[in-house]
């Protein structure tokens, strides 16, 4: 069977898996590590071609995280929000997503994905948003996420919040700090880390359509 579930589990499937795995394999020609140097070849291939879509998604995410990327950032890059024609998204976030879109194509489902590094636990829907994922937060600090309501019997008087995941939106819990991190707050923080807009305007060229 698959040796995965090191960083993710998911409900659904990754329909773009062939393109995702092929492009990751193509990138290996230009990959290098200043720390591992020649030993870096032992890391390759990034993706186990014999694995399932779950295993391949896990391979890619683990590779980014083990390379030094923060887990939520790696998830945002691999499973982005629908941003290109989003009229309510801030320009900073659009610039962020456009910047990373040149480096990583979306891993599209339909899939609901749960991820963790032991301290952070999160969930995200792919940008198509076709897998149901609902969650409750209770007054005694439980968070219950499932594909349907009624999976567990919960006293309705204890529920302080009920909501559902939306396409590309992230539910993230910091178990060390004991708090839920707001999606907008998290992503604006990442979007503020670099002047992505400047990089995009400097490196991207829009060709005329006529």
Predicted feature residues:
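Intein/HINT protein-splicing elements and their conserved insertion hotspots or analogous self-processing inserts
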Residues: 37, 41-82, 159-205
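Conserved mixed alpha/beta core segments that line enzyme active sites in large multi-domain catalysts
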Residues: 1-23, 63, 68, 72-174, ...
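Short, small-residue-biased leader/transition segments that mark boundaries at the very start
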Residues: 3-4, 206-209
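A short, polar/charged loop-to-alpha-helix boundary motif
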Residues: 23-37
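Short, glycine/acidic-enriched loop or turn micro-motifs at the edges of active sites
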Residues: 14, 177, 209
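A detector of low-complexity, intrinsically disordered, Ser/Thr/Gly/Pro/Ala-rich segments
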Residues: 16, 204-207
């Amino acid at each position: 069977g698959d040796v995965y579930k090191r960083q993710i589990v998911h409900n659904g499937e990754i329909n773009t898996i062939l393109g995702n795995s092929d492009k990751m394999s193509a990138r290996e020609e230009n990959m290098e590590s200043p720390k591992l140097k020649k030993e870096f070849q032992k890391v390759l291939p990034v993706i186990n071609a014999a694995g399932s879509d779950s295993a391949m998604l896990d391979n890619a995410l683990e590779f980014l995280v083990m390379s030094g990327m923060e887990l939520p950032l790696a998830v945002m890059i691999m499973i982005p929000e629908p941003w290109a024609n989003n009229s309510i998204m801030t320009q900073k976030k659009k610039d962020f997503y456009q910047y990373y879109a040149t480096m990583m194509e979306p891993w599209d489902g339909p899939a609901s994905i749960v991820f963790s590094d032991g301290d952070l636990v999160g969930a995200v829907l792919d940008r198509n948003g076709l897998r149901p994922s609902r969650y409750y937060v209770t007054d005694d600090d439980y968070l219950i996420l499932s594909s349907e309501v009624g999976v567990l019997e919960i006293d309705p008087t204890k529920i302080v919040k009920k909501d559902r995941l939306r396409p590309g939106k992230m539910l993230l819990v910091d178990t060390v700090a004991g708090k839920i991190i707001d999606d907008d707050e998290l992503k604006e923080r990442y979007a503020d880390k670099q002047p992505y807009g400047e990089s995009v305007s400097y490196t991207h060229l829009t060709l005329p359509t006529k």
